[in-house]
């Protein structure tokens, strides 16, 4: 494992920034990656194609769910095992993660291609959107194995402490995507199919980059299949610990599909407006998530090493960081909402609606970090069941019923307001969990 001092003895704030900054850059790159498709498709001036990108969006959540379930679970276990001095277990985790990611990617790819028509109908396509959504999905499905591999391998590389190398892979993948997006979409006139092709190509390059690092420079990490055969039953532990991340991503996709099904009843412009508002605020939630996920190895290592004092300080500093960041970026997004929405939508009616909906989404920015942090803490200490329940709250148990209730009460505005109510409710419960752990760590530290 690289940089052991970073995990064990370094300044807490220095350790946080050393792990969080590369993770943030990776997430920003992913956001840029995600926004590039909608931005260049938006340049076509076709609201139906913009809406098609939004309708297929939940498929990205399905792929991300598989990747994060494997990658986050493996990352937490690898860091915790290293803290306890169990290096060989890390190799087993790495091997299991890589090969399971590959085979699941192939299965998901086949499933998406075979079931694309009923899937798109379920996701909320109407007659105007469907032809574009089908083209986008077909190309995306072919690249599913590379999407899953690139995302899970990025987490493995960070778990070894090589956050910079993980960042480089994401940068290269996004650079490829941003170069080929305008070429495929605008120059060659492939439209949404070109956006999907550029995304697949970018993920392929990122996968190759991570594979090269692991093969040539990995210490705990390996892609050799033999370690996986030594203890295949360990896959259950990895999946259990990574399940909260997977559930969160999957539920985000389900919530998005339910939202689109409700929005499409208000017209294609409503789907496009909510998609633009979501892209505008996605940067905030993704960066906060990156801070928490990037620092998860620090939490897991401190817990595995029995260092209660350091774990307590990590939690306090991360709470402060995520709340302050949420306040500042939420205010900035509110102030610049017209320019941000205008990046994705040119049609006047959809633009005006998008600027209204984004207000609801930014109001929850100060507290969303509490939910991410509490989930990552529970994963780091091996409390998988608690993390699963917490993941179910924000995107599932709270948001999905609220979408239908608020749509019935307030229409399109209510759909956006449902996200705010769910964010605040989940954050309140998460705050209670974090306070419980802080008190327990204070008592444990006092006993030492």
Model-derived regions: residue spans:
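N-terminal transmembrane alpha-helices
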Residues: 8-39, 43-44, 58-73, 77, ...
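Hydrophobic transmembrane alpha-helices of multi-pass small-molecule transporters
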Residues: 62-65, 177-182, 207-211, 283-286, ...
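Short alpha-helical transmembrane segments in multi-pass integral membrane proteins
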Residues: 1-20, 78-145, 187-243, 299-364, ...
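Interfacial/gating helices of multi-pass transporter permease domains
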Residues: 41-61, 127-132, 192-193, 234-241, ...
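Small-residue-rich hydrophobic transmembrane alpha-helices
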Residues: 50-110, 147-166, 260, 273-331, ...
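Helix-terminus/linker motif at the lipid-water interface of multi-pass membrane proteins
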Residues: 28, 32-50, 120-127, 183-190, ...
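Transmembrane helical elements of multi-pass membrane transporters/channels
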Residues: 18-37, 139, 150, 173, ...
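Short runs within selected transmembrane alpha-helices of multi-pass transporters and secretion channels
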Residues: 71, 140-158, 166-174, 195-208, ...
């Amino acid at each position: 494992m690289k940089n052991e001092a970073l995990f064990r003895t370094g300044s807490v704030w220095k350790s946080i920034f050393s792990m969080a900054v590369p993770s943030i850059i990776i997430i920003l790159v992913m956001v840029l990656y995600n926004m590039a498709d909608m931005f260049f498709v938006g340049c076509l001036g076709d609201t139906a194609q913009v809406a098609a990108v939004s309708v297929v969006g939940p498929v990205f959540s399905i792929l991300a769910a598989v990747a994060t379930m494997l990658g986050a679970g493996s990352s937490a276990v690898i860091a915790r095992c290293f803290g306890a001095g169990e290096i060989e277990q890390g190799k087993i985790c790495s091997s299991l993660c890589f090969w399971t990611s590959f085979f699941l990617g192939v299965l998901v790819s086949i499933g998406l291609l075979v079931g694309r028509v009923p899937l798109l109908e379920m996701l909320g396509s109407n007659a105007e959107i469907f032809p574009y959504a089908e083209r986008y999905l077909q190309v995306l499905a072919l690249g599913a194995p590379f999407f899953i591999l690139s995302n899970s391998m990025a987490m493995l590389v960070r778990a070894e402490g090589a956050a910079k190398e993980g960042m480089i892979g994401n940068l290269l993948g996004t650079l490829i995507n941003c170069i080929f997006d305008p070429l495929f979409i605008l120059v060659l006139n492939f439209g949404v199919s070109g956006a999907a092709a550029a995304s697949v190509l970018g993920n392929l390059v990122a996968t190759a980059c991570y594979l090269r690092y692991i093969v040539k420079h990995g210490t705990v990490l390996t892609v050799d299949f033999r370690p996986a055969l030594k203890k295949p039953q360990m896959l259950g532990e990895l999946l259990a610990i990574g399940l909260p991340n997977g559930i969160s991503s999957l539920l985000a996709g389900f919530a998005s599909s339910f939202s689109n099904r409700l929005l499409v009843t208000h017209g294609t412009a409503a789907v496009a407006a909510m998609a633009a508002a979501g892209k505008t605020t996605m940067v905030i939630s993704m960066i906060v998530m990156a801070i928490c996920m990037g620092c998860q190895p620090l939490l897991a290592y401190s817990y595995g090493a029995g260092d209660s004092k350091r774990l307590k300080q990590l939690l306090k500093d991360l709470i402060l960081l995520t709340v302050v960041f949420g306040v500042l970026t939420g205010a900035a997004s509110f102030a610049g909402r017209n320019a941000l929405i205008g990046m994705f939508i040119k049609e006047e009616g959809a633009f005006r609606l998008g600027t209204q909906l984004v207000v609801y989404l930014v109001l929850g920015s100060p507290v969303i970090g509490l939910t991410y942090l509490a989930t990552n803490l529970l994963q780091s200490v091996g409390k998988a069941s608690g993390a699963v329940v917490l993941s179910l709250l924000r995107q599932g148990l709270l948001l999905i019923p609220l979408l239908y209730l608020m749509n019935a009460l307030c229409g399109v505005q209510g759909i956006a307001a449902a996200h705010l109510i769910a964010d605040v409710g989940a954050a309140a419960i998460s705050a209670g969990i974090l306070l419980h752990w802080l008190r327990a760590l204070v008592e444990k530290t006092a006993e030492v």
